[in-house]
């Protein structure tokens, strides 16, 4: 269909522009429901995509679509591993499967609960409900480390060594289960050096 824009009134142009924006937004929502990376881009406006992000997103989509049962991701710090795996993935999972259960484990309960707070806040956002209509937090979801959706789904955060007896999960996320404590000796060309004394740009032996 061809439109002669020059023959349209200003009001008609405004209306057409509105309809096009609504169509584009509807496409964006549908894309975000279907794929993890489009969900990231919609929910995280400042996200800058790197070459590795598509690979991680494909792996997560495989897990959610039942093509993989488990994956292990090893990356250097500051490559958005935790943001992807421990914040956006659980939120996306509960958007698609709001009646399922998630367990988030980290080396300390404080870290795990911190992730839980961010996931909870993400699920409670209005733009999340735009992508997944009808999915929201349950009315009593106050605790950051243990909360539920309004569809019966549950989120539980725990530190390594915490009690998990009787707990089950449809999605288990383990982020940094081992952390090097202060004072941990690291081998370097000059001998063993405490981890907190390592210099930026120095060499270590792995």
Where do the PLM segments sit?
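Signature of the SF2 helicase/ATPase Hel1-core->accessory helical subdomain module
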Residues: 171-179
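N-terminal accessory segments
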Residues: 1-69
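Post-Walker A helix-loop "phosphate-sensing" segment adjacent to the P-loop in P-loop NTPases
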Residues: 92-101, 124
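SF2 helicase motor core recognition
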Residues: 82, 162-169
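Walker A/P-loop
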Residues: 68-88
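Conserved nucleotide-state-sensing and coupling region of NTP-binding domains
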Residues: 105-161
């Amino acid at each position: 269909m061809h439109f002669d824009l020059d023959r349209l009134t200003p009001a008609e142009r405004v209306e057409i522009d509105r309809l096009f924006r609504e169509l584009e937004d509807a496409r964006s929502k549908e894309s975000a429901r279907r794929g993890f990376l489009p969900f990231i881009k919609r929910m995280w406006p400042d996200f800058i995509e790197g070459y590795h992000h598509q690979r991680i997103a494909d792996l997560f989509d495989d897990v959610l679509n039942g093509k993989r049962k488990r994956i292990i991701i090893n990356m250097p710090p500051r490559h958005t591993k935790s943001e992807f795996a421990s914040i956006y993935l659980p939120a996306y999972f509960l958007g698609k499967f709001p009646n399922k259960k998630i367990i988030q484990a980290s080396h300390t309960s404080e870290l795990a609960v911190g992730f839980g707070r961010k996931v909870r806040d993400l699920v409670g956002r209005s733009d999340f409900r735009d992508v997944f209509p009808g999915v929201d937090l349950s009315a009593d979801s106050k605790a950051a480390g243990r909360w539920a959706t309004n569809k019966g789904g549950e989120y539980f955060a725990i530190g390594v060594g915490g009690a998990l007896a009787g707990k089950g999960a449809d999605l288990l996320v383990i982020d940094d289960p081992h952390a090097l404590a202060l004072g941990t000796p690291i081998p370097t060309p000059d001998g063993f050096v405490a981890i907190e004394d390592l210099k930026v740009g120095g060499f270590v032996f792995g």
